[in-house]
């Protein structure tokens, strides 16, 4: 049986190991998952209360257009309902965009170290992928602009960026957008938008009024704590959203997910508290890194990235202590947890780096 040739160069997405899978390797004790940037505090209590009270007819298909949820999003963000597209997580939204826009001979431009699904779906559609190195962990928009050409159909900007947690500020993003042809779609992935505290972070929704080639992506999987429900959304001009709806699967978001997201979107107090606690958690890690001269990227998300050598060793040390983090070739990414969880990981990091220093001293004196 024949499939697309380009599939031979790709692998299925491999998520981080679950606590159950970790037990098979590291022993039968409890594990704290801090690898996938989920909300360690769960979702709004209102969601749990309402879902217990409500009744859904599970024999019926969901509202294919997610009308109530889209209207709720539109009302809060001051856009039209027709400007909102919902998907089964941002993964599906990214797939929809790629399928609708890309064809063989096109190219996309993005960063080297960023969310891998941009690249994945471009290759599936037979496109060239142009990746630009980060500049100190941040998207280099000047360099990205220099490699955009007439065949560039999408520029993907993850802001704040995953896995580094860094961001492009308002001035740089606005300047970049002004220099890109409206024939090129600029997708700004703001999955971690709710966690941002930087004063100069871009407010992208007003840009939609002036630029027809911008899409903004957000999700309920992170700050809202609804990752298992799989729901994300895009906001853009009506004409573009209408075309993306053509490739959207019928009934793509379950009734349960729509209801949970609608309730969660109205609980501003919950999000404010989550952001407050998350900011405190980031300060825990930042203080530790500064005191011990360990490099880190200033994060605007619910995780912190340490650009260090031997990320695999740090992963192993954390795993043996009951913490699941995400290793990378050039460092580790750690989801911010509860205060106690953060203290536990920091204790492991402290021991790891002390052992490393001791080993270096011993080798120097040998």
Curated annotation (Swiss-Prot):
Source organism superkingdom: Bacteria
Keyword annotations: Amino-acid biosynthesis, Aminotransferase, Histidine biosynthesis, Pyridoxal phosphate, Transferase
Coiled coil: none
SUPFAM superfamilies listed in its UniProt record: PLP-dependent transferases
Tagged with keyword Transferase: yes
Cofactor: pyridoxal 5'-phosphate
GO biological process, one term: L-histidine biosynthetic process
A single GO molecular function term of this UniProt record: pyridoxal phosphate binding
EC number(s) recorded for this UniProt protein: 2.6.1.9
Catalytic activity: L-histidinol phosphate + 2-oxoglutarate = 3-(imidazol-4-yl)-2-oxopropyl phosphate + L-glutamate
N6-(pyridoxal phosphate)lysine: residues carrying this PTM: 222
Family of the protein in this entry: Belongs to the class-II pyridoxal-phosphate-dependent aminotransferase family. Histidinol-phosphate aminotransferase subfamily.
Quaternary structure, from the entry: Homodimer.
Protein name per its UniProtKB record: Histidinol-phosphate aminotransferase 2
Origin species: Bacillus thuringiensis subsp. konkukian (strain 97-27)
């Amino acid at each position: 049986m024949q499939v697309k040739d380009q599939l031979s160069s790709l692998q299925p997405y491999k998520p981080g190991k679950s606590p159950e899978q970790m037990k098979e390797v590291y022993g039968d004790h409890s594990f704290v998952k801090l690898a996938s940037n989920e909300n360690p505090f769960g979702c709004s209590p209102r969601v749990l209360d309402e879902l217990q009270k409500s009744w859904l007819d599970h024999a019926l298909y969901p509202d294919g257009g997610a009308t109530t949820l889209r209207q709720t999003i539109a009302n809060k963000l001051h856009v039209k309902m027709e400007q909102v597209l919902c998907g089964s997580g941002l993964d599906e939204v990214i797939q929809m965009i790629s399928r609708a826009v890309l064809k063989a001979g096109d190219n996309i431009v993005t960063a080297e170290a960023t969310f891998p699904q941009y690249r994945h779906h471009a290759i599936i559609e037979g496109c060239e992928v142009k990746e630009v190195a980060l500049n100190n962990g941040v998207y280099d928009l000047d360099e990205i602009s220099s490699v955009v050409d007439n065949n560039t159909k999408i520029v993907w900007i993850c802001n704040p960026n995953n896995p580094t947690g860094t961001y492009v500020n308002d001035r740089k993003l606005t300047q970049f957008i002004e220099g890109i042809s409206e024939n090129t779609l600029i997708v700004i992935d703001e999955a971690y938008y709710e966690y941002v505290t930087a004063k100069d972070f871009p407010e992208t929704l007003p840009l939609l009024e002036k630029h027809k080639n911008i899409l903004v992506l957000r999700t309920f999987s992170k700050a809202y704590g609804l990752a298992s429900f799989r729901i994300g959304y895009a906001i853009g001009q009506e004409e573009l959203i209408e075309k993306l709806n053509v490739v959207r699967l019928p009934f793509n978001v379950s009734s349960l997910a729509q209801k949970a997201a609608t309730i969660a979107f109205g609980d501003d107090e919950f999000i404010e508290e989550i952001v407050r606690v998350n900011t405190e958690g980031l300060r825990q890690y930042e203080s530790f890194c500064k005191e011990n001269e360990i490099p880190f990227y200033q994060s605007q998300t619910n995780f912190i990235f340490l650009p260090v050598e031997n990320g695999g060793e740090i992963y192993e040390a954390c795993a043996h202590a009951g913490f699941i983090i995400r290793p990378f070739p050039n460092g580790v990414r750690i989801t911010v947890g509860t205060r106690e969880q953060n203290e536990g990981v920091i204790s492991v990091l402290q021991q790891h780096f002390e052992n490393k220093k001791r080993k270096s001293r011993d080798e120097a004196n040998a």
